[in-house]
Amino acid sequence: QGHDSKLLTDLENFYRSAKKQFDSDEDFRNRSREAVVNLQSGSDFESEHWKTFIETSMSHCQEIYERLRINLNSSHVRGESSYNDALPAVIQTFKESNLLEESEGAQCIFFEGQKSPLIVQKADGGFLYATTDLAAVRYRVNELAAHRILYFVDSRQSLHFRQIFAAIELAGLNPNAASLEHMAFGTMLNEEGKPFKTREGGLIKLKPLIEEAISRATQTLSLIHI
């Protein structure tokens, strides 16, 4: 476990360093985008590294679930890239439904009364968070037989989820009428009043936060003799 914790820390540091170089180095930025497309296309090289990263991350998530007695397992919890194989089919579904329009080379879904479309495929062939979210809904509805799907994400993503839910309905990807709900909340801010960002560091980790909550609750209960 000590090794896994170190590897997770290494991944976080790697992510921050990569983001810094991505912002300042055009060649690195282009190669990074190419690597994403390769990963989404199933390239062996990128996929091998992804599997190592995702296994490390998910093992820590599972530890938190067990600590909180949440009954989730690997069939319920899937990393973003686990939907890669399903992304082309998602695009094809919307294409066959005549819901896609090309805009500056990208494939988009436009909604009546809205200026901003939902972009589902970039001009270079890469997919986006929206594409993955659409694939995830289809998986949860069809494979997990979910009746209600809740998204606990801060309110800045409200438009994104409204568009996702609308696109799902337009394409008929929710045949059992599962309830799709965005449980919006306020933005988590650091001591400077700015949103936390993984890429910039300084995050409060969930595991020590839970441990502190348990410790404080235990102290409080001991004081009132419960």
Model-identified regions with their sequence ranges:
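NTP-dependent nucleotidyl-transfer catalytic core
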Residues: 1-225
